[in-house]
Amino acid sequence: MRVKRGLAAHRRHKKYLDMAKGYRGGRSRLYRTAREAVERSLCYAFRDRKVKKREFRKLWILRINAAARLNGLSYSKFMHGLTLAGVELNRKVLADLAVREKDDFAKIAELAKSKLN
């Protein structure tokens, strides 16, 4: 008996076309174009999940540096002072304090400054 693969092909095509919903023009309607667009987008998504971590760390360091300089310390001296003081706050929390709780950040900066001298 002859096996017809229409159902499998239809499901495969449908899978890519569903993933390409919202794309413009043929990228959402033509199977081959949609497949290429989806595969490329998945590559970008994979890559950018890694890039996101780097970008956020960069942003946190930038914010901590700006706040530390307002308190008379460079970023590296501030972080070294925190290490000497035994403060184990991560960069994400420090950056959040620098933006939202300036007074608390100033106290932490004073602690770091006192441990440096």
Swiss-Prot record:
GO terms for molecular function: rRNA binding; structural constituent of ribosome. The keyword Coiled coil does not apply. PROSITE patterns: RIBOSOMAL_L20. InterPro entries: Ribosomal_bL20 (IPR005813), RIBOSOMAL_L20_CS (IPR049946), Ribosomal_protein_bL20_C (IPR035566). It comes from the Bacteria. Keywords: Ribonucleoprotein, Ribosomal protein, RNA-binding, rRNA-binding. One of its GO terms (biological process) is ribosomal large subunit assembly. One of its GO terms (cellular component) is ribosome. The keyword rRNA-binding applies. It holds the Pfam family Ribosomal_L20. Belongs to the bacterial ribosomal protein bL20 family. Binds directly to 23S ribosomal RNA and is necessary for the in vitro assembly process of the 50S ribosomal subunit. It is not involved in the protein synthesizing functions of that subunit. PANTHER family: 39S RIBOSOMAL PROTEIN L20. This is Large ribosomal subunit protein bL20. It comes from Nitratidesulfovibrio vulgaris (strain ATCC 29579 / DSM 644 / CCUG 34227 / NCIMB 8303 / VKM B-1760 / Hildenborough) (Desulfovibrio vulgaris).
